[in-house]
Every structure is written in C-alpha cells, then in structure tokens.
Amino acid sequence: MIVIQAALNVIFMFNNFASMVLSTGVIVLVLGPVYALLITRVAKRGASLAYLTMVGIVYLASGNWYLLPWYVLVGLICEAILWRGGSCQDPRKVIAACTVSGFLHQGTNLLPIVLFWDTYYAFSTSAGQDPTYVNDYLLYYTNPAWLAFILAFTLACALTGGVIGSRLIQKHFQKAGVL
C-alpha cells in the first residue's frame, strides 16, 4: 500500500492544485479497498496500527519526523474502532476505521501549518523550494473555503473507499470462502 501511495504521489506532484487539493482524497479512495482487505484478512488486533506505523516510518525516513507520532496516533484511533472481538469482520467497523484512517491522512498536509509554520517556511525557502509551491500551499491550507473543500473531499473519498472495499470483500472474497 505504501508503494501505491508513493506512486500516486509522484503522479500528482506535477501540478500544485492536484498535489495539494486532490491527491490525498484520490489516494485514500484507491487505498480504501486495500486497507479494508488488510483489516478483514489479517483480522487481528494491531494490523491497522502496524500498517500506519510503517507509513509513519516512511515519512520519518524522508525527514518528516512529526508524522511518525501522528500515524501511531491514527493507528491507535483505528484500533479503538476495531477493538471488540470480531470487529474486523464487521463491515461498519471496517468502513469506519477506513474512513478515519483516510481522513486523518490529511494530517500530512495540515500539521506543518498547525505545529510549526515558521520553521517549515524557513526550511522550504532555504532548501530551494519553489516559492509558487509554498504560496499555493499557504493559499489552499489557510483559506477556510479551500480547507473545507479539501477536508470534505478527503472525507468523502475515504468513506467511498471504505464502502467499495467492504462491498468487494463481501461480493468476492467472502463468497469465494477466502475470508
């Protein structure tokens, strides 16, 4: 799943609007069914936490240290949703965990502004980041209308990805006796 996410990020990075506004939503839409299958197939406590911790480690390796604790927290929230015995087989719980995981994935874009904008801005400009990128980032993530759209789009895509995943699991995997 991490490889799919990285590949989609590469595709979206050629346009600031697509990268900042659409990419997270599309990524969680595409990964929703895979995440739902992971949770349902493994069907053990800690699967979501393990996956999201690995995502955090990838971000840590790329220099975004603050995303490791974020993804561990997101993993713990998803594990709390799936905590009861048999919840990994409950489509509603799987959809809820998928939606929360996908929606909170938007934290990768929001945390730099919320936690340390001055440091992020200084580092970006000193590292040679394109000023247009930084200005667009500021436009999309500080303008309430754009932020509302981005969050609503991401939430809708995360929910849709979870529903698609749950339906695919019921239609194909459970019918075939794999799950």
Give short role names for the model-derived ranges.
Residues 1-50:
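Hydrophobic transmembrane alpha-helices
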Residues 1-5, 27, 31, 35, ...:
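Alpha-helical transmembrane segments in multi-pass membrane proteins
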Residues 1-5, 72-110, 162:
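Short helix-perturbing small/polar motifs within transmembrane alpha-helices
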Residues 12-21, 55-84:
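Interfacial aromatic-anchored transmembrane helix boundaries in multi-pass membrane proteins
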Residues 25-26, 48-53, 68-69, 95-99, ...:
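Hydrophobic alpha-helical transmembrane segments
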Residues 27-43, 54, 58-59, 77-86:
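Generic transmembrane alpha-helix motif of multi-pass integral membrane proteins
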Residues 96-170:
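Membrane-embedded alpha-helical hairpins and interfacial helices in multi-pass inner-membrane proteins
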Residues 169-179:
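Short, charged juxtamembrane terminal tails flanking transmembrane helices
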